Amino acid sequence: MLVGQGAGPLGPAVVTAAVVLLLSGVGPAHGSEDIVVGCGGFVKSDVEINYSLIEIKLYTKHGTLKYQTDCAPNNGYFMIPLYDKGDFILKIEPPLGWSFEPTTVELHVDGVSDICTKGGDINFVFTGFSVNGKVLSKGQPLGPAGVQVSLRNTGTEAKIQSTVTQPGGKFAFFKVLPGDYEILATHPTWALKEASTTVRVTNSNANAASPLIVAGYNVSGSVRSDGEPMKGVKFLLFSSLVTKEDVLGCNVSPVPGFQPQDESLVYLCYTVSREDGSFSFYSLPSGGYTVIPFYRGERITFDVAPSRLDFTVEHDSLKIEPVFHVMGFSVTGRVLNGPEGDGVPEAVVTLNNQIKVKTKADGSFRLENITTGTYTIHAQKEHLYFETVTIKIAPNTPQLADIVATGFSVCGQISIIRFPDTVKQMNKYKVVLSSQDKDKSLVTVETDAHGSFCFKANPGTYKVQVMVPEAETRAGLTLKPQTFPLTVTDRPVMDVAFVQFLASVSGKVSCLDTCGDLLVTLQSLSRQGEKRSLQLSGKVNAMTFTFDNVLPGKYKISIMHEDWCWKNKSLEVEVLEDDVSAVEFRQTGYMLRCSLSHAITLEFYQDGNGRENVGIYNLSKGVNRFCLSKPGVYKVTPRSCHRFEQAFYTYDTSSPSILTLTAIRHHVLGTITTDKMMDVTVTIKSSIDSEPALVLGPLKSVQELRREQQLAEIEARRQEREKNGNEEGEERMTKPPVQEMVDELQGPFSYDFSYWARSGEKITVTPSSKELLFYPPSMEAVVSGESCPGKLIEIHGKAGLFLEGQIHPELEGVEIVISEKGASSPLITVFTDDKGAYSVGPLHSDLEYTVTSQKEGYVLTAVEGTIGDFKAYALAGVSFEIKAEDDQPLPGVLLSLSGGLFRSNLLTQDNGILTFSNLSPGQYYFKPMMKEFRFEPSSQMIEVQEGQNLKITITGYRTAYSCYGTVSSLNGEPEQGVAMEAVGQNDCSIYGEDTVTDEEGKFRLRGLLPGCVYHVQLKAEGNDHIERALPHHRVIEVGNNDIDDVNIIVFRQINQFDLSGNVITSSEYLPTLWVKLYKSENLDNPIQTVSLGQSLFFHFPPLLRDGENYVVLLDSTLPRSQYDYILPQVSFTAVGYHKHITLIFNPTRKLPEQDIAQGSYIALPLTLLVLLAGYNHDKLIPLLLQLTSRLQGVGALGQAASDNSGPEDAKRQAKKQKTRRT
C-alpha cells in the first residue's frame, strides 16, 4: 500500500520519501524502518468554524491514548499514523460545547480490508454550538441548582430544548445552530427577579446576554420548651450585608424591651413562632445572617438556647438547626484587678466547677440559664490570683458582686551568655523575693531550665536577688544587678532581668606598611583549652581589635603572621572588674621565601628605588629565603630557555607569601622546507585538552628575512655615506658610490617557527598553504622539559592541484562533490558561494578526479567543453528538512501536506528531506507526525507562489521512548502474535501502550513517557493460546533512553509435555552415559535416546500430554568386568506440562579377585609337576604346557562373555526389576 496521495508528478531531481509500506504487528528492533499506515479524513461543517481548535485522538479499545493530532485550518483534513494492527477508537475532541456526528468511530485495522488500509476517509460532521448561561442568586456570583430553563426561537412559544441548572447555577444547551434565541427560567417556590434573557449564536459557543436572577430563598425553624411547641417567641434577624428592602415577608418594626449585646449587628426584621412552634422568613437573599430569639415574661427575660445563631443562606431553601429551647434566666457580674480597679478581660469564671464563661474587654461576664440556688464562683487569669466566693443567686439578683484580684505574678529571666568552662554548668538557680516589710518572710523559687522564674505576690514593695554558687563566682560568673527592686500594684510585674557581666579586651596592631589580614588569639592561662581567635583585615598601617564577652582571669594574647617579624608576638593581660585596653603589637620586618623548580638566573630589584638595587642571581633548584627590612614591591624576572607561569613575578610585602617559580613551558623549534615561496601557515595542536590550537603565520622564509636584513643594512650604510659626504665636501660627492647587491631569492626556502610546550606535552604540527601540499602532512613530537628541546620538527612542501568551476546562472548553495576516480566515497564536499563559484584545492597532482553537483529542487548538467562548470534549472515546490534536536536528519516522520484538492502523506528517509514539486499556487497546510516526537513548528499554513521554491526546516524533539524485547518459549523458540502491553503505575496509571510480537518474537512498545514506571506484561485478551508468562510482568522505569532486552518466557496452552533431567555422577563417566525413554508397555525399544556428552543435564523433545506411562533409563558403556554399578530408572505419567528427573550413577571399580581365583586352581597341579619335573622332565614339560594353555583359553572365554553382557543384561534386569515411580 502506498502511504501518500498526491497530485502532480515528482521532478527528476527531487528526492522523495514515497515508499511502499506494509502494516505489521511490530516494527524492527531499532531504526527508522518502522511500518506505518495513515488513517485520515475530514471534519465537515455547513457553517463557518475554526478547524484548528479541533483535535482528533486515537485510543485503544481499553481507553489508552495512542496518538493525537489537529486538523488542517483550511479544509479540516487530518491524518493519524498507525504502527500496529488491532482494534482502535477514533474520537473527535472539539472545543467544549461543539457537537459532532459521530463523536467516535471504531476501527478494526487488519492491514487488508479496513478503511484506513484502503485509503478511505473518516468524516465527522458538525451539528452545532453550545449556549451557556447562569441563574444567579441576587448579589452573588453563583446560583442554585434545580431551576428549569427553556430555549426557544425569538418570537415563538415552542420550546426547542429544556434543561435544569447545575450546582452553581450553570446551564447549557447543545447542538444549537446559528440564530437568535430566548431563554426563560421557572421555579415552583422561589421568586425570580430576572426570569428571561436572550442569546445570539454566530460561529462559536455563545453566552446568554445576561444572567437570570433568583430574588431569595425561604428559611424556617422551630422552638420548644420541655418538648412542647412554644408560641409567641420572637426571632430577630440581623445582617451586615443584606438590606431591609431585599427581605420579603418579615416585620421590620423594632421589638420593645430588646437590648442587643453586639452593637455591630444591623437589625432587619423579626418573625413570631406559631402554634406549632415553627417560624419562617419568606424570602431571604443569599448571604450571612444572625437570628436572636427573644422571649420576655412579666418580670424577667428568659433565656432561649441557643441565644444567638449565625447561619448562611447560599443557593437553596434552609431549615435552621438546631431547634430552639426556652431555658432559665441570666445574671451578670464583673472581674476587677483591684477594689476600684479596671476590668480583667479574658478571665475564666467557673460556676460550681462546671459552667465556665470568659469575661469581655471590660471584665464583665454573663451566666445564662441559671436557676435559683447557692453557687461557688471562682475566677482564673494567668498571672492574677483570686479567692473563691459563695453566693446565692435568684431572679431578683441579676447583678453579682465584683470579683477582685488578691495577688499578682512577679516574673523574670536570668541571661547567661558564657558559662565558665572550669565548673559544671547549672541549669537552675535559686531566686529570693524579699519584702520591704521586715515582718514578712523570704520567698525562694528555682528557675526552670531556660532561666525563667515567677513569684506570687500581694501588692507591696519588694526586691529580688539571685543566689549564685561560690564556685561559679570564683570562676568569673557575675550577674548584674545584684538586687532588683520592684513595686507590685494592680498588675503583674514581668520585666525582672539579671544579665551576666562580661569584659572586653582591646588593643592595636602597628605595621610597617599596610597590615592586610592578621590573626589575633586570646588564650586563657588559668582555663586550659579556652582559646579565641579574631581575624583582622584592612589596608592601613594600624588596626585595632576587641575581644568581647571575656570572663575575668589571666590571658595570653598573640598575633599570628609567620611571614612578618614582631617586637612582641604575645602579651599577658589580666581581666578583673574592668575592660582591658592598650594592648599593642608592633611589626619590625618582612621575610621573602622563593621556591624554584629549575636552576635559573633571576633579576631581582625593588620598584621605585633606582637601578642601584638591581641584582642578578644564579639560583639553584630549591627554596631561598630573604630577609627584608623595608616594605614595598619587589620584581623578580626569570631568564631561561624555559618559560614560567609569568614573565616576571611581583612580591608585595603587604601580602606576604611563598614566591614559587615553576617552569611550565619549553622552547620547541621547527622548520618547513618548500621548493616554492608561498604563504605557509602552521597549526600546532596540543594533547592537552585545555590548550587551544595555535596558528602561526603566514610565515616568512629565512631567505626573505635575510634579504630584508640586507636591504636594511644597505639603507643604513647609504644614509651614513650621505651624512659623511655632506661633511667632506663636494669633491667626495663627485665619486660614484659603490653599488651594493642583495642575494637573489632562490629555493629551497626554509620557514622557521617555534612553540612553547609543557612538560610531557605531545604536539601535532600541521602546515597549510593555499597552493602547497606537505610531506608528511603533520608531525608529532613529545617534549620532556628537562632541557631545551631544540629543533624537533622538519617538514617539506610541494605545489598542489586546484579544481575550480561555476554554476550558470549564478546559484548559491549547490553541493559540489569531488571524488578520486574509481573511489566509492567522496573526497571533498563544498558548496558554491553567492556568485555560484567554487574552488577546491590544493589536491595531489598525480591523481585523477571526478566532479559532480546537486541541489534540492534543481537539475544540474555539466557544460560541454568545460571541466567543473554546470547549468542549473530550477523546479517549483516545497522542500522540508526534518531534523532531530541534535541537528541530525530524522527519518520515519510522516509528513501530511494538504491544500485544495491536493493531499499527500509521505515518510522521510535517512536524509530527513521531503520535496513536493510542481505544486499549484495556493495555501497548503503541513503537519509532521511521528510517535514519541513533538515538532516545531507542529503545523503551519504556507503560501506557495507560482514558480516559488520554499525550504522549511522542522525540528523534532523526543518526548517519549520505546521498550524493546522478545517473547519466547522455554526452549528459546520465538513466539509470534503475542499481545503485549505496558501499563503505567502510580501517577502514570492513565497511560498505557500495546503491541503484538512479530515472527521473530520481538516487540516494541512505543510512546512510554519519561519518569513513569510501567509493567510490561501479556494482555489479558488476545492470548488464548498462552497459558502463563514468566515473569508475570517486568517493571521498567523510563528515563531519557530506549529500554532494551525486556524478555519474557511464555508457556503455550498446547498438548505438549516437556521432559528434562540431570544426572548426579562424576564428570569422568559422562561420555559413557546415555538416557533412554521407553513407553512402559514396551521396554525393548526406546522411543528417544539422548547422549549426555559433557553436560550433567539432559532434555528430551516435547512429548504429547496424553497421560501415558513412561520409563526413563540410564544406560552406560562402562565394562562390568571392571566396574560394579546399578542403572537407575524412573517411571512417570505424562500429566501436566513438565517433568524433571534426577538420576544417580555411582559405579565402583572392581578389585582383581577373579585373577587370584583362577591362579589358585592351577597352583597345586603346577607345584606337583615342578616336583616331578626333576625325574621325568622330558615327558612332563610338554604335558604341563598343554594344560596351562587350555586353562587360559577357558578364562579368556569367560571374561569375554562377561564384557559383552552389559546392555542386554540391563534390559532383562529392567524387565525383572520393580521400577521406581515419581
Swiss-Prot record:
Residues of the signal peptide: 1-31
Subcellular location: Endoplasmic reticulum membrane
Cellular component terms per the entry's GO annotation: endoplasmic reticulum membrane; multi-pass translocon complex
Keyword Glycoprotein: yes
Organism: Homo sapiens (Human)
Biased composition (Basic residues): 1213-1222
Binding partners and assembly: Component of the back of Sec61 (BOS) complex, composed of NCLN/Nicalin, NOMO (NOMO1, NOMO2 or NOMO3) and TMEM147. The BOS complex is part of the multi-pass translocon (MPT) complex, composed of three subcomplexes, the GEL complex (composed of RAB5IF/OPTI and TMCO1), the BOS complex (composed of NCLN/Nicalin, NOMO and TMEM147) and the PAT complex (composed of WDR83OS/Asterix and CCDC47). The MPT complex associates with the SEC61 complex. Due to the strong similarity between NOMO1, NOMO2 and NOMO3, similar interaction pattern probably occur for the three gene copies.
Cytoplasmic topological domain residue ranges: 1177-1222
Stated role: Component of the multi-pass translocon (MPT) complex that mediates insertion of multi-pass membrane proteins into the lipid bilayer of membranes. The MPT complex takes over after the SEC61 complex: following membrane insertion of the first few transmembrane segments of proteins by the SEC61 complex, the MPT complex occludes the lateral gate of the SEC61 complex to promote insertion of subsequent transmembrane regions.
Transmembrane residue ranges: 1156-1176
Protein name (Swiss-Prot/TrEMBL): BOS complex subunit NOMO3
Membrane topology note: Single-pass type I membrane protein
UniProt-annotated glycosylation sites, renumbered to this chain: N50, N218, N618
A Gene Ontology molecular function term of the record: ribosome binding
Region (Disordered), start-end ranges: 1198-1222
The keyword Isomerase belongs to this UniProt entry's keyword annotation: no
Alphabetical UniProt keywords: Endoplasmic reticulum, Glycoprotein, Membrane, Signal, Transmembrane, Transmembrane helix
Topology Extracellular: residue spans: 32-1155
Pfam families tied to this protein: CarboxypepD_reg, Ig_NOMO, NOMO1-like_1st, NOMO1-like_2nd, NOMO1-like_9th, NOMO_12th, NOMO_3rd, NOMO_5th
Example of a GO biological process term: multi-pass transmembrane protein insertion into ER membrane
InterPro entries: Carb-bd-like_fold, CarboxyPept-like_regulatory, Ig-like_fold, NOMO-like_N, NOMO1-3_2nd, NOMO1-like_9th, NOMO_12th, NOMO_3rd
Main location: endoplasmic reticulum
Domain of life of the organism encoding this protein: Eukaryota
Gene designation: NOMO3
